[in-house]
Amino acid sequence: MENFKHLPEPFRIRVIEPVKRTTRAYRDEAILKAGMNLFLLDSEDIFIDLLTDSGTGAVTQDMQAAMLRGDEAYSGSRSYYALANAVKEIFGYEYTIPTHQGRGAEQIYIPVLIKKREQEKGLDRNKMVVFSNYFFDTTQGHSQLNGATVRNVYIKEAFDTDVDHDFKGNFDLEKLEQGILEVGANNVPYIVCTITCNSAGGQPVSLANMKAMYQIARKYDIPVIMDSARFAENAYFIQQREAEYKDWTIEQITYESYKYADALAMSAKKDAMVPMGGLLCFKDNSMEDVYNECRTLCVVQEGFPTYGGLEGGAMERLAVGLRDGMRQDWLAYRISQIEYLVQGLEKIGVVCQQPGGHAAFVDAGKLLPHIPAEQFPAQALACELYKVAGIRSVEIGSLLLGRDPKTGQQLPCPAELLRLTIPRATYTQTHMDFIIEAFKRVKENAKNIKGLDFTYEPKVLRHFTARLKEI
C-alpha cells in the first residue's frame, strides 16, 4: 500500500458500542456536579473519551480467542507459563510476577528495593532520593508514600513546544550523575526509565541514552527499573529516528532495550492492549533476592505469584497482546493518527508538543496565557472542551504534579499540557476531525475561560478525586 497520502485503519470493526449525544446545557451541569474534575464524570456522559489509553481500547481477535485457553488453577497455572514464556521471548527476562495493573507492581517493588538498599548500603531514609527521566504519577506517588524524594532529570528540550527533538524523553545524563553524587549513591534505591515519557508528551528515549544511563547506574550499583507501559511505541520511534536501528525489527529493538535495565514494571493496559493487567519482571539471578521478596509481597497484596490478581484467561490474553502490540503496521498507523491530530490542531493555531506516542499534547499555557499555573490552565481547558463537545481529556500539568510533601508548596511544573489520549483501534479519522473542529470553537472563546481553585484537595494523587470551582 505504498505512496498513498492517507491509509485507512489497518483493521475491520466487528463490534460497536453506541454512544449518547448530549446538549451543552446537560454538559454544563454534569461538569459542575463533577467538581470540574473529568475523572468524576460518568462515562455515559462522554461523547469521545480521551482521558487515557489505559485499558480503554479494542482487543484483537487472537487476544479474545486466547481467553478460552485460560487455566484457572490457583497455583502453577499453565496460563502463567504462557505469559512467562512470552516475557522471556520478548524482553529476555527470567522471572515474571503478574499483577492486576502497573501500580500493583509498584506497590511491591518500591518498598523491597528501599529495604534492600537500607540493609546492604546503609540508605538514610531522611536523605532518600529516586531519579527518573520523568516519573508517572502513580510511580511518583508510591515513591513518596515510601518516604522518597523524587527527581525528574530530563533534557532542556523536553517541555519546549517550540523545539523539535527526536528523543525528548531522554535523561539529562549530567544532571543524573550530579544528583547521585549530591545525595550519595547509597541513598538512591532505584532509577526509573519511563518509556515512552508520558509527562513530556509521550516522548521516546533513545537506545544510546538508555545505554549511557545504565552505565551510570552500574557505576554506582543502583538498580534500574524500566517503566514499560509503552515499550512498543518507544521501539518504533527508535526504529524511525535512531539511524543505527533503522533496519532492526520492533522485536529486535525491544529485546536490545531491555538489556539496559534490571527489572521492568508494566501497566499492560497500554501497548499490550489488555483491559486489565500488569507485570513485574526481573532480568536474571542478580535480582533473585528481590524477586523472592516481591513474590512474598505479591501473595499478600495481589494474589498467588502465578496469577497475581489475574484470571487464567487474562494471562493468556496478555501473552498474545504483548506480541500483537509490536506489529509494525499497527504501530505505523497508531503514530500517524497522532501526527494527523497534532497537524490539524496546529493548522488552526493550537500549539502542541512535538508528536509522540499515544496522545496529542496541547500547550494550554500558550492557549490560555491569562490563567496562571496555580489556577491550572490545562484543567480549565479540559473543562471547556467537555462543555463545548463532550470530549473528555486529561490535565498533565501543575494539578497532576501536586505539592512538595515536605513543604506543602505547589511544585513548579515545566509545562501546562492537556493530553488528548487516543485509545487503540477505537476512534477513526472522522473523530480526529471532530476534535479539531471542537478546538477551533474553544480557541474562539479562550479569553473567557476562567482559572480554577480547590474546594477539596486530597494529599496524594489529588488530580484523581479533587473537586474544584471556577475563580
UniProtKB/Swiss-Prot annotation:
Keyword tags: Lyase, Pyridoxal phosphate, Tryptophan catabolism
EC supergroup of this enzyme: lyase
Keyword Plastid in annotation: no
Residue positions where N6-(pyridoxal phosphate)lysine is found in the record: K270
Single GO molecular function: tryptophanase activity
Required co-factors: pyridoxal 5'-phosphate
Pfam families: Beta_elim_lyase (PF01212)
EC number(s) per entry: 4.1.99.1
Catalytic activity: L-tryptophan + H2O = indole + pyruvate + NH4(+)
Gene3D superfamilies: Aspartate Aminotransferase, domain 1, Type I PLP-dependent aspartate aminotransferase-like (Major domain)
Pathways per UniProt: Amino-acid degradation; L-tryptophan degradation via pyruvate pathway; indole and pyruvate from L-tryptophan: step 1/1
Superkingdom of origin organism: Bacteria
Record-linked PANTHER family: BETA-ELIMINATING LYASE-LIKE PROTEIN-RELATED, TRYPTOPHANASE
HAMAP family: Tryptophanase
Assembly notes: Homotetramer.
Family of the protein in this entry: Belongs to the beta-eliminating lyase family.
Protein name stated in the entry: Tryptophanase
